[in-house]
Regions:
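C-terminal catalytic "cap/lid" subdomain
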Residues: 2-62, 66-267
Length: 267
């Protein structure tokens, strides 16, 4: 079992990704795909007159502030355009993919966090009306049912709160939770960079390996969204996942390349 998370940033080759996944699936590889959609969500939000707002926590993590209107735009893009676009690509390759959000069947479940602390102009502010959370429970029964029935699950945020409310969750950490719950042998975090870079954005500064015992040392070099990927990797290896790879989703055969060790390998 492997779990593949593909980001939603510009430059990602979804056609190559889906072609690669289809070949692996047809060869018998059990797999769950988790995806994002940040760039398209930003574009649609701007077009609808509700531009995205990002906040930085006191610990340095950046996330999307998700008020109710933002959540509705988020669902429209992630669950609609992005999810069905990926499912359609896989179906064209003969894979019976099934697109679901974490809200469906409570596949992903966690605690709703109504407020978030944000550093603005050097001061810490508390912003209320946030619809975010962290995945604490994965419905593995439903995922295993789908897999055993021949369906390839294509998952995306939002998740469900314990009260049944939709919450925005970080996709990388959600994928780590899925990989842990399914006891995956590998978690592949694919994005629009070749891996963790020692000197971002210099792609020649790729860090090839990080010991599993010292994953969080990667936070020293992680910039912006990569910080959440490193955090997700740490959670995955702590949960028993065999290895995590930060790989490049812009190249041909990105999944097999990551499985072969191209990128940053955490093991």
């Amino acid at each position: 079992m492997i779990v593949v998370k593909v980001g939603g940033s510009l430059g990602i080759d979804y056609d190559a990704l889906c072609a690669d996944i289809a070949e692996l699936w047809k060869a018998g590889q059990r797999l769950v795909l988790v995806h994002g959609g940040s760039a398209e969500t930003n574009r649609i939000a701007e077009a609808l007159g509700h531009p995205p707002r990002f906040v930085t926590s006191p610990s340095g993590y950046t996330s999307r502030f998700t008020d109710r209107e933002t959540l509705e735009i988020f669902e429209m893009v992630y669950c609609g355009k992005m999810n069905k676009g990926i499912v359609e690509r896989l179906q064209r390759h003969g894979v019976n993919a099934l697109g679901l959000s974490g809200l469906d069947g409570r596949i992903l479940e966690g605690k709703h966090k109504d407020s978030v602390r944000s550093v603005e102009n050097g001061k810490v502010k508390v912003l209320r009306g946030d619809h975010t959370g962290t995945v604490e429970r994965v419905n593995t029964d439903l995922l295993e049912l789908l897999l055993s029935s021949g369906y390839l699950p294509v998952l995306t945020p939002p998740a469900a709160s314990f009260e049944g409310v939709a919450i925005n969750v970080d996709g990388d950490r959600a994928a780590a939770a899925v990989a842990t719950a399914l006891r995956a042998e590998a978690l592949l975090l694919l994005s629009n960079v070749p891996g963790l870079l020692r000197d971002f954005p210099d792609e020649s500064s790729l860090i090839a390996h990080i010991p599993a015992s010292d994953v969080e040392s990667g936070l020293e070099f992680a910039q912006d969204r990569m910080k959440k990927k490193v955090l997700g990797a740490a959670e995955a290896v702590a949960g028993g996942v065999g290895r995590v790879v930060f790989g490049d989703a812009r190249i041909a055969s990105p999944v097999r390349a990551a499985l072969a060790g191209r990128g940053t390998v955490v093991s």
